[in-house]
């Protein structure tokens, strides 16, 4: 994760996905002088920092996330931890990668894999739809932006790289494989 301080406040951000048009977005960002990127990976701008830069172009986190997801050709799923302890979870606009919310005795959690919180005694509470944005607190969660209608989940979750004890869209990976 990266720690970001901007006009939107202090927040930590982590992302998963692929930004196919990263160079184009970087060039657009540089067209307004005074910007730079600090996190580089293999000579390229770090995709998480690029996502944060896109988010910071708007007046609030929700509008910023929607802007970033619309600008990205590819997939952008993210989690943001705000300074007041809330988690903002956003699934990519096509729903390629999962985002799941767990519920347990100690509160709520969020993960890209259901087995991660099952091992801690949490149960499934919600799976975000494509483009959906949710705010998660210890005592519950609420939808900040409703899900879109088009779903293009990655089929390789069940056949190749999903953990056998994970569930995606209500279907267990191990059951789907055998």
Language model segments and positions:
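Conserved short alpha-helical segments that host acidic/polar catalytic motifs at enzyme active sites
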Residues: 1-129, 135-178
């Amino acid at each position: 994760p990266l720690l970001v301080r901007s006009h939107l406040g202090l927040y930590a951000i982590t992302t998963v996905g692929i930004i196919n048009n990263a160079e184009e977005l970087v060039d657009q960002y540089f067209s307004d002088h005074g910007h730079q990127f600090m996190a580089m990976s293999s000579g390229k701008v770090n995709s998480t920092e690029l996502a944060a830069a896109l988010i910071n172009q708007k007046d609030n986190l929700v509008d910023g996330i929607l802007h970033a997801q619309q600008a990205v050709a590819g997939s952008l799923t993210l989690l943001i931890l705000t300074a007041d302890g809330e988690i903002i979870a956003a699934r990519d606009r096509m729903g390629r990668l999962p985002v799941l919310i767990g519920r347990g005795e100690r509160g709520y959690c969020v993960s890209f894999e259901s087995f991660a919180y099952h091992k801690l005694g949490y149960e499934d509470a919600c799976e975000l739809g494509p483009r959906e944005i949710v705010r998660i607190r210890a005592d519950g969660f609420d939808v900040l932006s409703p899900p879109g209608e088009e779903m293009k989940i990655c089929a390789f979750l069940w056949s190749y790289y999903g953990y056998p004890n994970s569930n995606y869209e209500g279907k267990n990976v191990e059951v789907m494989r055998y």
